[in-house]
Structure formats: structure tokens, C-alpha cells
């Protein structure tokens, strides 16, 4: 692991676009449905337990959370979508904010889409891929919680996910990931290194 990830620290949160930090430097955002393990993935990638808050309550992460690696580089935890028990008006606001962030944020240089390996490509995942394709953003898909399946089943799910992706977004890449047994951590770190311009 590059030591820069271990220097990650919470920088701030934004509920609206006006609260975002200055649009400069480089950011990689983590997106996904509620309770797919985005926060756990960020914690595992940085090696800092508890950096990004995790919760058994879906939708708990309702703000855009920024984690700073250095003066120019950030990891961003986007709001989870799908199960949050909030009014529809709030959900619409989240979607508008997310859409605007993806379309307008110049510092954004890549998206990590976190997908539960047992529930491949829900409507939100496909919407996210469409947003990224229209913007020309590179995407890395983490099939998280791969430890929940036996190796054969996990590899079968990976093949299925990869085949489907070739039809909808051939530029994206898919990998297995588990925050529990650390499957795929080095692979996603290598991708982040490339996007963020981090040396060895």
C-alpha cells in the first residue's frame, strides 16, 4: 500500500453543491446503493478502520463526505441510495445533487461503483454508469462482499458482471472485492494510483 492512503483524514461534508470544497485538485468518488459497503471499502483501502463511518442502517450516509490524502488528492464518499427511510423530496434532492456533482465537478477523475456481488446491477447502478458514460468518466466496479460466496460462485458472478458490462459500458472494469478478507485491495489501490497520479 502506498503510504499516502494511510494519511487519509476526514476533511468535511456537503449536503448541497454550494457546500463543496473548491473544485480543484483530483478526486475519486465512491458510489453505490445503500448498504453495499462503500464506507467499509474506503476504510479497507486506506487501512484506517473507522475513517468512513459504517452503519447497519441503510441510507445513513446522507452527505458527500471528503477524505483528504494530501493537498491535492481526495477520496469522496457519495450518499447511498435505495433504502433510505426519508421523504421522497429529500431523495429527489440527493439525486439532483449527485447528478450535478457528476456532471460539473472538474476535479472528479474517476468513479468507484460499489455493487453487492449478490445483487448485480440494480437500476441505480445502471443510472450511475450512464452518468459516467455521458461525462466520459472512467469507472471501476467493485463486486463487494465477495467473501459471502464460495470462490466458484464469486468467479461466476464476476464473469456475469463483466459480460453484461461489455454491453452497456465497455470502458469500465470489474473486480472482486472484500473488506473482510482483503480480496482485491491491491488492485483497486493500483487503479486509484493511476487516476490520482500517485507514484510508487
Curated annotation (Swiss-Prot):
Keywords: Cell cycle, Cell division, GTP-binding, Magnesium, Metal-binding, Nucleotide-binding, Septation. Its cofactor is Mg(2+). The keyword Nuclease does not apply. GO terms for molecular function: GTP binding; metal ion binding. HAMAP family: GTPase_EngB. NCBIfam families: GTPase_YsxC (TIGR03598). Belongs to the TRAFAC class TrmE-Era-EngA-EngB-Septin-like GTPase superfamily. EngB GTPase family. This is Probable GTP-binding protein EngB.
Amino acid at each position: 500500500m502506498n503510504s499516502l492512503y494511510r494519511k487519509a483524514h476526514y476533511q468535511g461534508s456537503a449536503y448541497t453543491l454550494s457546500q463543496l470544497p473548491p473544485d480543484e485538485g483530483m478526486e475519486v468518488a465512491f458510489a453505490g446503493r445503500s448498504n453495499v459497503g462503500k464506507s467499509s471499502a474506503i476504510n479497507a483501502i486506506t487501512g484506517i478502520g473507522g475513517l468512513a463511518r459504517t452503519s447497519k442502517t441503510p441510507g445513513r450516509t446522507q452527505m458527500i463526505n471528503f477524505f483528504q490524502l494530501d493537498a491535492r488528492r481526495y477520496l469522496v464518499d457519495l450518499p447511498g441510495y435505495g433504502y433510505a427511510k426519508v421523504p421522497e423530496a429529500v431523495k429527489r434532492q440527493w439525486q439532483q445533487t449527485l447528478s450535478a456533482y457528476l456532471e460539473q465537478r472538474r476535479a472528479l477523475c474517476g468513479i468507484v461503483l460499489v455493487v453487492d456481488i449478490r445483487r448485480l446491477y440494480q437500476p441505480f447502478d445502471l443510472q450511475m454508469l450512464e452518468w459516467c458514460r455521458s461525462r466520459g468518466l472512467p469507472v471501476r466496479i467493485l463486486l463487494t462482499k465477495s467473501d459471502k460466496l464460495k470462490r466458484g460462485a464469486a468467479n461466476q458472478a464476476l464473469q456475469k458482471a463483466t459480460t453484461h458490462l461489455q454491453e452497456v459500458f465497455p470502458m469500465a472494469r470489474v473486480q472482486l472485492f472484500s473488506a473482510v478478507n482483503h480480496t482485491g485491495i491491491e488492485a483497486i489501490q493500483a487503479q486509484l494510483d493511476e487516476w490520482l497520479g500517485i507514484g510508487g
